[in-house]
């Protein structure tokens, strides 16, 4: 019922823009059954099933990529690196020598994501422990647990973001809080009872989060007070996909578990536009929305739904390109190019303006042909741009290094398996292994 009412309201607000010219703000119109049906009709039109892309497209011999120099990154304060959820071309010494291997950081399962701030690695485990490991002292300098005994048996799924000495945390119990790890003190804490289910974003003095009911929250990051609550469609059941929040220059871009993408003005928190990317409104366990993280770059938005990859205009949500392939990994937008690994393991380079494919290669076939590599062992954890090359990190600890043209240079064997999403800071590669130890390579 909540979903039905919400869709009616959204139709009233005009599905692509929110102006004051039509009289809708003065209750001058009522929505008929035909118009209600049109809402559902439009939602279904947005995404249609097409045969999945499965084609090798070689790079034209005369094509030249325009690349900037790699950057020496010095911090990783956001799970997805920055407010745009986009990665850079990182500088890495590429010696692949172990600089540091920590002791076991926790006896409990650690989060796949961790942060880096002021020479400290910040991570958490399922017991709710916040752990700060100093690379200078080569030891844990802070270990803090916010939770009381009554939550002892609950697995705590925490979402972190750090700014200065403050770690901001939301969880699956309904708490959101700010913790100063330098003085070991809670700054503020609020309990909203409903589990939070999204990454966190910071801008100005605000912190943005979302819960499992697909409500979008904007808090004052100094006091923790709620500034704005924006409801959206609620899904009765959830899968592994969680709400995703990304910021561009003027707007909050919010993708919820119903498959709806919203643009919200950062200054007045009004809707700019919305778009539904789900393929069906029949929500059951077999057809729940699933897709990639959203990435913003310049005036475009990039993301995958279950079966399609989209390029959208950030100003109005207009579809610039829709492709018949999809990815669970977020794309990397670099210069004028998109780099993407599809669900069926094709590496693609595309034009970021129009989505035109520059090249497409079956990674499994390339690796198997060159290195007699078992295709079944090619389970991709993540990929990054490093020193102008493409590094594909496999779960078994191998790294496939390709040049920017999609040709394999080598396969690197890491000293241990990969159990987290790797990061690169200060020209070092950092990751957690399956024994909950931090590994640093130069």
Residue ranges and their predicted role:
Residues 73, 97-115, 139-161, 185-204, ...:
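Extracytoplasmic beta-rich repeat domains
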Residues 134-138, 180-184, 220-224, 265-269, ...:
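Short loop/turn segments that connect beta-strands within beta-propeller blades
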Residues 334, 340-350, 356, 361-402:
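Loop/turn-rich, solvent-exposed surfaces of beta-rich toroidal or solenoidal domains
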Residues 12-53:
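Bacterial Sec signal peptide processing site at the extreme N-terminus
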Residues 38-57, 62-99:
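Blade/loop signatures of beta-propeller domains
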Residues 416-442:
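Blade-level signature of beta-propeller repeat domains, shared across WD40, Kelch, NHL, RCC1
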């Amino acid at each position: 019922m909540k979903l039905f009412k919400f869709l009616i309201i959204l139709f009233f607000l005009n599905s692509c823009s929110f102006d004051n010219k039509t009289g809708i703000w003065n209750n001058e119109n009522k929505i008929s059954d035909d118009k209600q049906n049109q809402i559902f009709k439009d939602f279904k039109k947005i995404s249609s099933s097409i045969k999945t892309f499965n084609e090798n497209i070689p790079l034209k011999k005369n094509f030249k990529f325009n690349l900037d120099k790699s950057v020496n990154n010095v911090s990783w304060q956001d799970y997805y690196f920055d407010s745009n959820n986009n990665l850079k071309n990182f500088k890495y010494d590429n010696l692949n020598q172990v600089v540091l291997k920590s002791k076991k950081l926790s006896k409990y399962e650690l989060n796949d994501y961790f942060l880096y701030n002021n020479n400290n690695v910040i991570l958490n485990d399922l017991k709710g422990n916040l752990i700060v490991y100093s690379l200078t002292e080569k030891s844990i300098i802070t270990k803090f647990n916010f939770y009381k005994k009554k939550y002892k048996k609950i697995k705590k799924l925490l979402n972190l973001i750090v700014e200065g000495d403050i770690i901001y945390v939301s969880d699956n119990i309904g708490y959101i809080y700010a913790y100063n790890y330098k003085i070991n003190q809670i700054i503020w804490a609020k309990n909203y009872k409903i589990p939070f289910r999204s990454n966190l974003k910071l801008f100005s003095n605000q912190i943005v989060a979302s819960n499992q009911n697909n409500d979008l929250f904007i808090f004052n990051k100094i006091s923790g007070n709620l500034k704005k609550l924006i409801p959206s469609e609620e899904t009765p059941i959830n899968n592994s996909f969680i709400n995703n929040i990304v910021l561009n220059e003027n707007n909050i871009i919010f993708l919820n578990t119903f498959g709806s993408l919203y643009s919200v003005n950062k200054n007045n928190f009004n809707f700019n536009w919305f778009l539904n990317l789900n393929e069906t409104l029949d929500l059951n366990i077999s057809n729940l929305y699933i897709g990639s993280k959203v990435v913003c770059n310049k005036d475009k938005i990039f993301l995958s739904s279950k079966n399609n990859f989209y390029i959208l205009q950030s100003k109005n949500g207009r579809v610039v390109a829709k492709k018949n392939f999809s990815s669970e990994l977020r794309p990397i937008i670099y210069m004028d190019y998109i780099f993407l690994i599809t669900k069926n393991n094709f590496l693609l380079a595309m034009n970021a303006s129009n989505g035109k494919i520059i090249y497409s290669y079956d990674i499994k076939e390339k690796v198997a042909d060159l290195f007699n590599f078992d295709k079944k062992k090619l389970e991709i954890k993540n990929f990054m741009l490093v020193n102008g090359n493409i590094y594909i990190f496999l779960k078994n600890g191998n790294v496939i290094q390709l040049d920017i043209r999609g040709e394999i240079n080598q396969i690197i064997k890491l000293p241990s398996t990969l159990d987290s999403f790797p990061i690169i800071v200060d020209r070092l590669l950092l990751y957690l292994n399956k024994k909950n130890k931090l590994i640093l390579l130069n």
